[in-house]
Amino acid sequence: TGTPVKILVVRNILLLLFCLVVLLVFAQSSFLPPCEPVNETVAVEKEGCPKCLVFQTTICSGHCLTKEPVYKSPFSTVYQHVCTYRDVRYETVRLPDCPPGVDPHITYPVALSCDCSLCTMDTSDCTIESLQPDFCMSQREDFPVY
């Protein structure tokens, strides 16, 4: 009579552990901000222009669910999804005090919608640690917000 009771106890413990893992996965994803457009202060600068321009725009930010396999096979590839642009519109700003001969205009993407997908280096910063979006190498010029 002792063996069926032990099997029942082990089964209940395994079921409880499974439920806890599922609960933790859902709890973690509900506390992390989703991938969505957010307002952010960014800086743009251009070689030849003495000042960088700091202004507000909309970027994609948030968390995407990822999977990291325990066993990494040399024959399989792991693709990690990141929060990146889905739909964008482009706007142009003029940098102040650029000397003659230097085009003072910079065009940048404005996020309309975001998506968890593979990182596209053409439109996204996919580095592990990057500079803050409002970092400037040159003198700052804050753009008035209307």
UniProtKB/Swiss-Prot annotation:
GO terms for biological process: G protein-coupled receptor signaling pathway; positive regulation of androgen secretion; positive regulation of estradiol secretion; positive regulation of gene expression. One of its GO terms (cellular component) is extracellular space. Keywords: Disulfide bond, Glycoprotein, Hormone, Secreted, Signal. Its main location: secreted. Residues 1-28 form the signal peptide. It holds the Pfam family Cys_knot. Disulfide bonds join C35-C83, C49-C98, C52-C136, C60-C114, C64-C116, C119-C126. Glycans are attached at N39. GO terms for molecular function: follicle-stimulating hormone receptor binding; hormone activity; lutropin-choriogonadotropic hormone receptor binding; protein heterodimerization activity. CDD domains: GHB_like. It is found in: Secreted. Transmembrane segments: none annotated. Heterodimer of an alpha and a beta chain. Belongs to the glycoprotein hormones subunit beta family. Involved in gametogenesis and steroidogenesis. This is Gonadotropin subunit beta-2. It comes from Ctenopharyngodon idella (Grass carp).
